[in-house]
A protein has these predicted regions:
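Short acidic-hydrophobic, aromatic-tinged amphipathic segments that line or gate anion-handling sites
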Residues: 96-100
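Charged/polar, solvent-exposed surface patches and flexible loops
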Residues: 31, 103-106
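STAS-typified acidic loop motif
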Residues: 3-31, 50
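Acidic phosphotransfer microenvironment of two-component signaling modules
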Residues: 80, 102-103
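Amphipathic alpha-helical interaction surfaces in cytosolic regulatory modules
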Residues: 23-95
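A generic structural signal for alpha->beta connector loops
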Residues: 1-3, 11, 70, 94
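Short hydrophobic/aromatic patches at helix-to-coil boundaries
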Residues: 2-4, 106-109
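Residues at or immediately preceding the N-termini of alpha-helices
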Residues: 26, 101-102
């Protein structure tokens, strides 16, 4: 199960994700992302307990779309478990990753 809270902060769309991002839930995240119109997005993963390969693919697709539109996407609040997955897959080199939402907002402005 996954819940997503979407807010706006100074022209940046913030998605606060809770639960698991997996093959069942990642289409919901992708759909919500495609509806937003901001050039800057932060995905807060602080309350994400699990992410699988389909979740990673969704985040990479979101990043590619933002870059193609001249925008930026940052991630924040990765747990040790989720951060480890990003490091193993080398995705930590692709994304702007911040320890918390405030730092992520500052980095992508």
């Amino acid at each position: 199960m996954m819940e997503i809270k979407s807010t706006q902060q100074d022209g940046v769309t913030v998605f606060e994700v809770t639960g698991e991002i997996n093959i069942s839930t990642s289409p919901e995240l992708k759909k919500l992302f495609e509806k937003q119109t901001s050039k800057k997005v932060v995905v807060d993963l602080q309350k994400v307990s699990y992410i699988d390969s389909s979740g990673l693919v969704t985040l990479v697709e979101m990043l590619k779309k933002m870059k193609a539109q001249g925008g930026s996407l940052g991630l924040s609040g990765l747990s040790d478990k989720v951060r480890s997955l990003f490091e193993i897959t080398k995705l930590d080199k692709l994304f702007v990753i911040s320890p918390n939402q405030q730092e992520a907002l500052a980095k992508i402005k």
